[in-house]
Design a protein with these regions (language model features):
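Helical "substrate-binding/catalytic lid" subdomain
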Residues: 1-100
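Short, basic/aromatic-enriched C-terminal tail that caps enzymatic domains
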Residues: 99-115
Length: 115
Protein backbone atom coordinates (compact mmCIF):
# COMPACT_ATOMS: atom_id res chain seq x y z
CA UNK A 1 0.00 0.00 0.00
CA UNK A 2 2.76 2.44 0.88
CA UNK A 3 4.56 1.98 -2.44
CA UNK A 4 1.35 2.41 -4.43
CA UNK A 5 0.52 5.49 -2.40
CA UNK A 6 3.89 7.04 -3.14
CA UNK A 7 4.25 5.97 -6.78
CA UNK A 8 0.69 6.48 -8.00
CA UNK A 9 0.08 9.31 -5.57
CA UNK A 10 2.98 11.28 -7.01
CA UNK A 11 1.61 10.84 -10.53
CA UNK A 12 -1.87 11.93 -9.45
CA UNK A 13 -0.60 14.90 -7.43
CA UNK A 14 1.39 16.05 -10.44
CA UNK A 15 -1.61 15.66 -12.76
CA UNK A 16 -3.81 17.61 -10.33
CA UNK A 17 -1.32 20.47 -10.14
CA UNK A 18 -0.79 20.59 -13.91
CA UNK A 19 -4.55 20.78 -14.40
CA UNK A 20 -4.84 23.44 -11.70
CA UNK A 21 -2.11 25.54 -13.27
CA UNK A 22 -3.79 25.21 -16.66
CA UNK A 23 -7.21 26.26 -15.30
CA UNK A 24 -5.62 29.22 -13.48
CA UNK A 25 -3.82 30.42 -16.60
CA UNK A 26 -0.45 29.65 -14.99
CA UNK A 27 0.61 26.72 -17.19
CA UNK A 28 3.36 28.65 -18.98
CA UNK A 29 4.80 29.91 -15.70
CA UNK A 30 4.75 26.41 -14.20
CA UNK A 31 6.39 24.94 -17.31
CA UNK A 32 9.13 27.56 -17.15
CA UNK A 33 9.73 26.91 -13.45
CA UNK A 34 9.80 23.13 -13.89
CA UNK A 35 12.13 23.42 -16.89
CA UNK A 36 14.54 25.57 -14.92
CA UNK A 37 14.42 24.03 -11.46
CA UNK A 38 13.42 20.39 -12.13
CA UNK A 39 14.46 19.47 -15.69
CA UNK A 40 15.08 15.87 -14.65
CA UNK A 41 11.33 15.44 -14.08
CA UNK A 42 10.36 16.11 -17.71
CA UNK A 43 10.81 12.56 -18.97
CA UNK A 44 9.20 10.86 -15.95
CA UNK A 45 6.17 13.18 -16.22
CA UNK A 46 5.96 12.64 -19.98
CA UNK A 47 5.86 8.90 -19.36
CA UNK A 48 3.90 8.44 -16.12
CA UNK A 49 1.00 10.83 -16.66
CA UNK A 50 -0.16 9.57 -20.08
CA UNK A 51 0.44 5.98 -18.91
CA UNK A 52 -2.00 6.65 -16.07
CA UNK A 53 -4.99 7.61 -18.28
CA UNK A 54 -6.14 4.10 -19.22
CA UNK A 55 -5.48 2.88 -15.67
CA UNK A 56 -7.33 5.65 -13.83
CA UNK A 57 -10.50 3.58 -13.48
CA UNK A 58 -8.44 0.90 -11.67
CA UNK A 59 -6.51 3.37 -9.58
CA UNK A 60 -9.65 4.83 -7.94
CA UNK A 61 -10.38 1.70 -5.87
CA UNK A 62 -6.67 1.38 -5.10
CA UNK A 63 -6.68 4.90 -3.69
CA UNK A 64 -9.71 3.94 -1.58
CA UNK A 65 -7.81 0.90 -0.27
CA UNK A 66 -4.99 3.23 0.70
CA UNK A 67 -7.53 5.38 2.57
CA UNK A 68 -8.41 2.32 4.67
CA UNK A 69 -4.74 1.40 5.09
CA UNK A 70 -4.02 4.84 6.52
CA UNK A 71 -6.38 4.16 9.40
CA UNK A 72 -6.67 6.93 11.96
CA UNK A 73 -4.93 9.70 10.02
CA UNK A 74 -7.69 12.04 8.84
CA UNK A 75 -5.43 14.36 6.84
CA UNK A 76 -3.72 11.55 4.93
CA UNK A 77 -7.06 9.86 4.33
CA UNK A 78 -8.44 13.07 2.78
CA UNK A 79 -5.49 13.27 0.41
CA UNK A 80 -6.18 9.81 -0.96
CA UNK A 81 -9.94 10.29 -1.02
CA UNK A 82 -9.26 13.26 -3.27
CA UNK A 83 -6.95 11.18 -5.43
CA UNK A 84 -9.65 8.52 -5.80
CA UNK A 85 -12.07 11.25 -6.92
CA UNK A 86 -9.48 12.56 -9.39
CA UNK A 87 -9.04 9.04 -10.79
CA UNK A 88 -12.78 8.66 -11.29
CA UNK A 89 -12.94 12.06 -12.99
CA UNK A 90 -10.02 11.28 -15.31
CA UNK A 91 -11.46 7.86 -16.14
CA UNK A 92 -14.78 9.47 -17.07
CA UNK A 93 -13.00 12.19 -19.04
CA UNK A 94 -11.09 9.63 -21.05
CA UNK A 95 -14.29 8.04 -22.34
CA UNK A 96 -16.06 11.40 -22.57
CA UNK A 97 -14.89 14.80 -23.74
CA UNK A 98 -11.21 14.21 -22.94
CA UNK A 99 -10.84 17.87 -22.00
CA UNK A 100 -8.61 17.17 -19.01
CA UNK A 101 -6.62 14.50 -20.82
CA UNK A 102 -6.02 16.95 -23.67
CA UNK A 103 -4.98 19.66 -21.20
CA UNK A 104 -2.46 17.31 -19.62
CA UNK A 105 -1.18 16.19 -23.03
CA UNK A 106 -0.71 19.80 -24.14
CA UNK A 107 1.12 20.69 -20.93
CA UNK A 108 3.44 17.70 -21.24
CA UNK A 109 4.09 18.27 -24.95
CA UNK A 110 5.12 21.85 -24.26
CA UNK A 111 7.15 20.83 -21.21
CA UNK A 112 9.19 18.37 -23.26
CA UNK A 113 9.77 20.69 -26.23
CA UNK A 114 13.43 21.51 -26.78
CA UNK A 115 14.36 24.83 -25.23
Amino acid sequence: MSYAGINKGTTLLTAAMLLGATRAGAADALRAELSESQPELRDPYARSIPDMYPKAYRWAPEMEEIVEFLGDDPAARLIFQGMAALCRRLAADQVGEQAEVRSLDVFIARLTEPT
